[in-house]
UniProtKB/Swiss-Prot annotation:
PROSITE patterns: G_GB1_RHD3
Top-level taxon: Eukaryota
Lumenal side: 781-783
UniProt source species: Leishmania infantum
Name of the protein: Protein SEY1 homolog
UniProt key word Nucleotide-binding: yes
Length: 895
């Protein structure tokens, strides 16, 4: 059964029809089992895929009505239409036809050897064989291959036969365009081209159709001119001399070869073939056949002998040097290959066989990729639906990874015969899309787990921002000012206006800019450390039940999901920290003022601080204002970054690396996407800090540092525009508002201190000493009365003396205050040791102290366990500050 491959108008059969035909001739049972084989028929595709490239293609060219179809029908058992001389002589084959050779004929390996031997035993066969042995010897330019080394296969590979339209026909006239197109088409697919030539026309140009040979030489030279063309892909030209009646074929074959060389020399060749012979482009073979009518008894054995050249790999003249089709096109891809080649030929495009093979590989790989991806997505959708219904799926990643490997193996199995570079490219694309589909399902599960983890870690992370800010305020509060000229004590005493005194004292202080910038860096470093501690706890193995809740068993059994949850949690915590810092920067003035109030009303150890004198308050105001200004420097640029977590990273990766890491494709993608939160400055960011001068001027904005986008790296890297939270105008505005709020708070504090003081006139104490001198001497000279007075003062006037001592600490000179405090501390320690030293009851007191210590040790573990699970939100509670209380008291007083 033959198929009209190309009609007389140059239309090629569709890919669907070609695939149906190939399925029919390769697997007739598959075609007959259904109504028709379709392109989507799985059995038909499997039959074609099973053959792969294990087939061959033979084509025939020659003059019109030269017996081409007759030769093919006898040689291969085909049913091509032949000329009916009784009706007329003219064009019979129009375009091109394709059929499969009948491998049941004698001469093919599937036939019995005895049948072949019997048919070759006649004298006529001997005569034909002698002629062809002489023809083979005369073809000195053709290299003979030792095909006998190949073992006979168990089944004969399909042999496809192409019958092309004859040349030099009346119907086409002088139009050789279609002839050239068919020649190029035949060379693009056929392993062997049979040139059908009459023996009596040897030595002639037109009668021997040497113009056809010239066309074949030119188009094959065109194919070979491409740089990526493979030199070993040379087609075989089998010149068959028909109706040969002479005894010695050598003179005729020498004439044919000379004609070939003449044509070759007359062709314009590229530089790489300038000195090459025709053997560089073709394997030349020759065969002579007796007269079809006059030597009928010799003609048929000659046909059977020639058939062995095509069907018997043990034959010395076997034409196919490889079992595979020499173009390397799998049979299931042949329809697409023929379509692409014919389209390029018909549109006068440059036909590049390697490019066509690559296009075919792309087409086939794309089909296989789409099919496997569709199958995997259908498989994954089942598990995704189960997750939507709330099921908890253990080892989900392992199931998806196994199916992914199955799909990839199926893809490689379908495309193993195509261009390896193209297959590798599409395999990478398929792997990427399969991993994306896998992670899409895993993300649905991981996000639910991450939400549970975030609900347990978010308060701690947000509290870490507050804790880092408290540490910053504590360090900034104790940061000394640079040496500078300040107001003298006399000038401060002479100031009558409290507001002017406070402003003058504040403005005179000069800040240590490098030290302040160092505090800013310590703030971000501390914040990064706090957040990474939380992330490390999330990554720890075994998973923590107080973090994962009901998912703890699932996480313990699914390492890939655990890594994915860790990535989601890390990214989410980073965004939450950034959101918190951004909100603090949006209200920078309030954040600075809160830091000022805390520094003013709390000591460096966190205890509340109260002022007894206005001078002590004025001394504390500059340090508190400096703390707020340092907070401004910390908020104007976000300095944490999400960077890729390397395999040798410590911290987060240590806990993960301590366990067996999964090696699946999805796990490698998850590990590749893993990040860690770090504080790091590039060269530009290291200089992108506010510069501080004095408290009465706003910090200087770093204008000299370049600002770039986040994707700039290397030498172009600068401060990232998205990380700048405050502009120069925003900094100045926040600073001015901060100064106003600090001045107002300082006024309230000063008024509160002034209102709380109980002052006596300066002349009262000297008057008491003068007027009560006799009474004072009487008390001093009477021991009993002196003891009574001391006891009364200690009991009833203790708070008065303590307040006076605090006032002395705040207002007294440091040269007197510090030695006095040292002496008092030493005396109190000595007195305490003397009181504890008692000979009698010492043992009893020691036992009581030991019992108290033991009781404390018993209570400590319980206290520690409670602290571990205490509500993190309690850490955000703020102790009411003194300024608020004083503000309310002042308002009531004004009312």
């Amino acid at each position: 059964m033959s198929l009209h491959l190309v009609d007389s108008d140059g239309h090629l059969q569709s890919e669907k029809r070609l695939k149906e035909y190939l399925t029919t001739i390769v697997a007739p049972s598959v075609s007959q089992s259904g109504s028709a084989a379709t392109a989507d028929d799985g059995d038909g595709d499997s039959a074609l895929e099973a053959i792969g490239v294990n087939y061959h293609v033979v084509g025939v060219f020659g003059g019109q009505s030269s017996g081409k179809s007759t030769l093919l029908n006898h040689l291969f058992g085909t049913d091509f239409q032949t000329l009916n001389e009784a009706v007329r002589r003219g064009q019979t084959t129009k375009g091109a036809f394709i059929a499969r050779a009948n491998d049941a004929l004698a001469g093919f390996e599937a036939s019995g050897a005895s049948v072949v031997a019997d048919q070759l035993a006649s004298g006529a066969a001997d005569h034909s064989s002698c002629l062809n042995r002489a023809a083979a010897a005369a073809a000195a330019a053709t290299k003979d291959a030792a095909y006998g080394e190949h073992g006979a296969p168990h089944t004969v590979p399909p042999l496809l036969v192409l019958d092309f339209e004859g040349t030099d026909g009346l119907e086409r006239g002088e139009d050789q365009c279609f002839e050239r197109q068919l020649s190029l088409f035949g060379l693009s697919i056929a392993d062997t081209l049979i040139i059908n030539m009459w023996a009596v026309d040897v030595g002639r140009f037109n009668a021997a159709n040497l113009s056809l040979l010239r066309t074949i030489f030119e188009v094959n030279l065109q194919l070979f001119s491409h740089d990526n063309y493979e030199a070993e892909e040379k087609p075989t030209l089998l010149i068959v001399l028909r109706d040969f009646t002479e005894d010695d074929p050598a003179p005729s074959l020498a004439t044919v070869r000379k004609s070939f060389d003449t044509i070759w020399e007359g062709i314009t060749r590229p530089a790489q073939f300038a000195g090459a012979s025709i053997d560089a482009l073709f394997h030349l073979k020759y065969y002579v056949m007796p007269h079809y009518k006059l030597q009928k008894t010799e003609f048929m054995p000659s046909v059977e002998t020639l058939r062995r050249w095509f069907g018997d790999s043990q034959c010395p003249d076997y034409l196919f040097s490889h079992r595979a089709m020499f173009r390397g096109v799998p049979l299931e891809g042949l329809p697409a290959y023929l379509t692409n080649c014919w389209e390029a030929i018909r549109t006068s495009k440059d036909l590049d066989i390697p490019t066509q093979r690559e296009m075919l590989a792309q087409h086939r790989c794309k089909e296989a990729k789409v099919q496997e991806l569709k199958t995997f997505r259908h498989f994954a959708r089942h598990y995704e639906d189960r997750l939507l219904h709330g099921e908890m799926l253990l080892r989900l990643s392992e199931v998806l990874d196994e199916e992914m490997e199955t799909r990839l193996a199926s893809f490689y199995r379908q495309t193993k015969l195509y261009n390896s570079d193209v297959v590798g490219q599409y395999a990478n694309e398929l792997e990427t899309e399969l991993v994306d589909a896998t992670l899409r399902v895993l993300n649905r599960l991981s996000k639910a787990i991450a939400a549970e983890v975030l609900s347990n870690t978010e308060p701690r992370v947000l509290n870490s921002v507050e804790e880092s800010l408290r540490q910053l305020l504590k360090s900034a509060q104790t940061l000394p000012f640079s040496a500078g000229e300040g107001p003298s004590a006399a000038e401060a005493e002479e100031a009558n206006d409290v507001e002017r005194d406070a402003a003058h004292l504040v403005g005179a202080q000069r800040m240590d800019s490098p030290a302040c910038q160092k505090l800013v860096r310590s703030f971000w470093r501390s914040l990064s450390s706090y957040v990474n501690e939380v992330v490390a706890e999330v990554a720890a193995m075994p998973p923590r039940a107080h973090l994962y809740g009901r998912y703890v068993a699932l996480i313990a059994q699914d390492p890939t999901t655990r890594l994915n949850v860790l990535n989601i949690v890390t990214d989410a915590l980073f965004q939450k920290v950034k959101s918190r810092v951004v909100s603090m920067a949006d209200s920078a003035c309030d954040t600075m003022h809160a830091g000022f109030e805390r520094s003013l009303t709390h000591n460096s150890d966190g205890t509340a601080r109260f002022f007894a004198t206005t001078k002590g308050l004025q001394k504390a105001v500059p340090a508190a204002m400096q703390a707020g200004v340092v907070v401004l420097g910390s908020l104007f640029y976000f300095r944490l970054k999400l960077v890729a977590a390397g395999a040798d990273d410590d911290g987060i990766g240590a806990d993960v690396a301590g366990t067996a890491l999964p090696q699946s494709r999805s796990a490698r993608r998850v590990r590749h996407d893993q990040h860690r939160i770090v504080f790091s400055d590039n060269d530009a960011e290291a200089a992108f800090y506010l510069s501080y001068s004095t408290l009465d001027t706003a910090p200087k904005y770093p204008y000299d540092v370049p600002v770039t986008s986040a994707d700039c790296e290397g030498e172009e890297a600068g401060a990232v525009a998205d990380c700048i939270l405050l502009s120069q105008q925003a900094i100045v505005r926040a600073y001015e508002l901060y100064r106003q709020k600090c001045d107002f708070t300082t006024q309230l504090q000063l008024r509160t201190v002034e209102a709380a003081k109980q002052r006596l006139p300066a002349w009262v104490i000297p008057a008491l000493f003068i007027l009560g001198w006799n009474e004072l001497l009487y008390v001093l000279t009477s021991p009993a009365l002196l003891v009574l007075v001391v006891v009364i003062c200690a009991v009833f006037f203790k708070q008065f003396f303590v307040s006076q001592w605090h006032a002395f600490e705040e207002t007294g000179p440091a040269s007197v205050v510090i030695p006095t405090k040292t002496v008092i501390h030493t005396l109190s320690t000595l007195v305490r040791s003397l009181l504890d030293y008692r000979p009698g009851p010492r043992t009893e007191r020691t036992e009581r102290s030991h019992d108290a210590a033991a009781a404390a040790e018993k209570e400590m573990p319980h206290v520690a366990a409670t602290a571990t699970h205490v509500d993190p939100t309690l850490g955000n509670a703020n102790v009411p500050t003194a300024p608020s209380t004083m503000r309310h008291r002042t308002s009531r007083k004004l009312d």
